[in-house]
């Protein structure tokens, strides 16, 4: 549903919509993580057809990387914080595959979810550096009723882990609301609120 929201937005703003479905091996620094990453190609194609996607590009790793990958991008601090701090090389892998996809498809616009905000920033930087005439469109996060952001990886979470992830989002959201509506004198009560999570 999260990815389909990107297709829906793209359909409204473009004559032709092309979607890529590819689990990119070079953005995983942990082989076990790559191995367990959810893959449902038949379901993906069915959902994309239902959403009205005009073409699906589903290459193999051999087609995308027939030769040894030697490209390297340096995004500076942008790739060394948050997710990049614990996944070295991840954003270089993202940049390489996105560059290849852009050069194959040559889109006018490309749609990415704001859920992966750091990735979105990396891709915007890549487009600027490479001077691609592509508009990068960030699309809002789609959430489950519980508030948990939709993700293919959610199926890997136990019920308890899902509840914890949901509570993290609730705590962040409520802390922002609290900060925006309360004054400094009331901040002591925030500790009570925080301890509840």
Ranges and model annotations:
Residues 1-197:
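Nucleotidyltransferase catalytic core that binds NTPs
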